[in-house]
A protein has these predicted regions:
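N-terminal "arm"/small-domain region of PLP-dependent enzymes with the aminotransferase-like
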Residues: 5-122, 252
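Conserved PLP-anchoring active-site segment centered on the Schiff-base-forming lysine
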Residues: 166-185
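Active-site phosphate-binding strand-loop segment of PLP-dependent enzymes
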Residues: 199, 203-256
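Active-site-proximal loop->helix
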Residues: 169, 186-195
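Short, structured coil segments at secondary-structure junctions
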Residues: 149, 173, 194-195, 250
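Conserved N-terminal alpha-helix of the aminotransferase class I/II PLP-enzyme fold
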Residues: 111, 115-158
Length: 328
């Protein structure tokens, strides 16, 4: 089965490239655009230390050094992420972590992680499709599905990769993705991977979204709307019922990233769905991470069976990745 799936994915990729090439009006690609076969290749094209990104970092660091400003990044924190942290033996109030419920370092969580290592080891050593499936994976996914009141859920080894592979796989060049202007980088990377048309709307402005859909919906096959439960850099949240009504009226999919709202919003901490009293089926794609309130690592997608089954068998970021470590 695995070989067949790989062959199918490769064939689909080749077909997409052939279609793209057939539709392109560009001239044939030369070996190195702008240079003849005997011309010398500029050094910045094959040296990492001349890469524009690295040069930008050097300029920033040199400027900070001249101003006597130390590098605030990659500080070595000692111990568990909590309301305080230690750096270089000195205690500080910690505003930089997202262990929202204090579960990272909780005795019960530590004990469960140790028990999982004793029973299953530190790695499942395979993708879940092949031989990496363990009872703890399905227990976690079924628990997430119950919390959201939906059919099923799927977990990924990376929160960032969850958005990238889900959006990147489900949507394509004939589709449109509309997103709040403040959505996370992972959603933007997923949109870029998909090849879909991307349009942003002003932060939390459901009326602007409605206007865009009124003008643009008929020009695309599938349309995805991407929001966040809580916007981590601003601390605010969308009027989700308004967005649900809009997506229904325009026959679009709605995806909500609950990385920072799950465990924080709602009477019982069950997220923005509980806060507004919505049904799980009001949102097509519930996304979240396991590294914030849930004190682990990775991400998840929750929704109807057709969505989850689809991702399990065909989403590259799940199919070709190792299953989550049992202690996580």
């Amino acid at each position: 089965m695995t070989a067949q799936l790989k062959d199918k994915l490769i064939q689909q990729a080749l077909e997409r490239r052939l279609r793209h090439a057939a539709q392109s009006d560009s001239a044939p690609l030369s070996l190195v655009s702008g240079f003849g076969a005997t011309d010398k290749i500029p050094e910045q094209h094959y040296r990492f230390h001349l890469h524009p990104g690295y040069q930008q970092i050097r300029i920033m660091n040199d400027g900070a050094a001249r101003l006597g400003i130390g590098n605030p990044f990659f500080k070595l924190h000692e111990g568990t992420a909590a309301n305080t942290t230690e750096i270089g033996g000195k205690s500080y109030i910690n505003y930089a972590s997202y262990n929202y419920l204090g579960l990272s370092g909780h005795p019960a969580v530590i004990a469960a992680a140790k028990a999982a290592i004793d029973q299953y080891g530190t790695s499942v050593s395979a993708s879940r499709l092949v031989s990496g499936e363990r009872p703890v994976h399905r227990q976690l996914e079924q628990a997430l599905a119950r919390v959201y009141g939906v059919d099923d859920a799927i977990t990924f080894v990376s929160g960032h990769a969850t958005n990238v592979t889900t959006i990147g796989y489900l949507f394509g060049p004939k589709d449109l993705v509309l997103h709040d202007e403040f959505v996370h980088n992972s959603a933007l990377q997923g949109i870029q991977l998909s090849g879909a048309r991307r349009l942003s709307f002003p932060h939390n402005d459901w009326q602007a979204l409605d206007n865009i859909l009124t003008e643009q919906r008929r020009h695309f096959d599938r349309v995805l709307i991407v929001l966040e439960g809580i916007y981590s850099m601003d601390g605010d949240f969308p009027d989700l019922p308004r967005f649900v009504e809009i997506k229904r009226r325009h026959f679009a999919f709605l995806m909500v990233d609950e990385a920072h709202s799950f465990g924080v919003m709602g009477k019982n901490g069950l997220g923005i769905r509980e806060h507004f009293g919505l049904s799980g089926n009001d949102v097509d794609i519930w996304m979240g991470t396991l590294s914030k309130a849930l004190a682990g690592c990775g991400g998840y997608i929750a929704g109807e069976s057709a969505l989850v089954e689809h991702l399990k068998f065909l989403a590259p970021g799940f199919l070709y990745s190792v299953g989550m470590p049992p202690p996580v």
